[in-house]
């Protein structure tokens, strides 16, 4: 499904998914279904939220970005110290810690639902940073092939 789209169509799709990541589960499920995704799972742990949308051919991970009313998100944005990534590079500690919260559940879910499917990651703002780190970790640590299209402002 997604691989058949043009780059412009992919950008539009992932911008929509990044926006859907801010919705509640019921609204997100409905919106994702209109885009061709048949299953929607929200992973929400200690203020870090990530949706996994699944279709017949794809799994799209959409990480929720900064919500100004959520102190957890503000704290994550402001925690600018450097941390080690799985590839040996230095990354933003607050963003890494948000991924740490959801990573195990995302990885377990992908092991069940992403067999023979393309995996994509996207997000806006804090969610864009999370998508980048999550995709890197899934590839380096677990051998998943993840395509990443970030929607960031």
Which ranges hold each PLM region?
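Non-catalytic, mobile gating and regulatory segments of ester bond hydrolases
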Residues: 1-122, 126-153
């Amino acid at each position: 499904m997604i691989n058949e789209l043009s780059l412009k169509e992919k950008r539009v799709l992932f911008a929509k998914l990044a926006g859907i990541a801010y919705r509640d589960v019921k609204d997100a499920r409905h919106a994702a279904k209109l885009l061709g995704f048949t299953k929607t799972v929200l992973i929400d742990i200690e203020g870090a939220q990530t949706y996994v949308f699944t279709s017949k051919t794809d799994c799209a991970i959409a990480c929720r970005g900064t919500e100004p009313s959520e102190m957890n998100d503000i704290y994550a944005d402001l925690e600018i110290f450097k941390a080690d990534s799985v590839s040996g590079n230095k990354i933003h500690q607050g963003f890494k810690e948000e991924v740490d919260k959801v990573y195990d559940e995302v990885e377990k879910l992908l092991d069940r639902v992403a067999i023979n499917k393309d995996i994509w990651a996207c997000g806006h703002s804090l969610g864009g940073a999370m998508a980048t780190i999550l995709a890197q970790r899934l590839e380096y640590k677990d051998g998943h092939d993840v395509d990443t299209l970030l929607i960031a402002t």
